[in-house]
Swiss-Prot record:
SUPFAM superfamilies: Ribosomal protein L6. The lineage of its organism: Bacteria, Pseudomonadati, Pseudomonadota, Alphaproteobacteria, Rhodobacterales. GO terms for molecular function: rRNA binding; structural constituent of ribosome. This protein binds to the 23S rRNA, and is important in its secondary structure. It is located near the subunit interface in the base of the L7/L12 stalk, and near the tRNA binding site of the peptidyltransferase center. This is Large ribosomal subunit protein uL6. Coiled coil: none annotated. One of its GO terms (biological process) is cytoplasmic translation.
Amino acid sequence: MSRIGKKPVELPSGVSAAVSGQTIEVKGPKGARSFTATDDVTITVDGNVVSITPRGMSKRARQQWGMSRTMVANLVAGVTEGFKKELEITGVGYRANAQGNTLKLNLGYSHDVDFTVPAGVTVSTPKQTEIVVEGIDQQQVGEVAAKIREWRSPEPYKGKGIRYKGEFIFRKDGKKK
């Protein structure tokens, strides 16, 4: 029995869901998203409640049951509130500037890094040392934030680089005399 899968997903006001076959489409104030489940589960919409049930009790069906329920819950959260990842830049001369769908990064290289932001995600820079990635697709927001962080991940000696807000960087001592 999946403890996650057996909980139904409630649809808040202003959000609608429609099921056709194995695909559920959720529409809300921030946009629309869809998810196609495997044949191991059945998705049903009753009023403002979405419930997922397994078609059998095989190990795969139970795994897909909990995963499908979480994916539908993420669809609902995305179209109502959206998802957000915040990044901090640490280092002398390291800064970021968002211009349209391009993020310009000065990260100590001999050239500026121009990062093109994909559709469905918005990137803003409230300060030169902060980057905010927002969107309705949790996976895409996390992927864009990870790609930005990849350009200069934090190093353990001085802590310079791009880190997630609140991320702990394990620090090392330098050489000892």
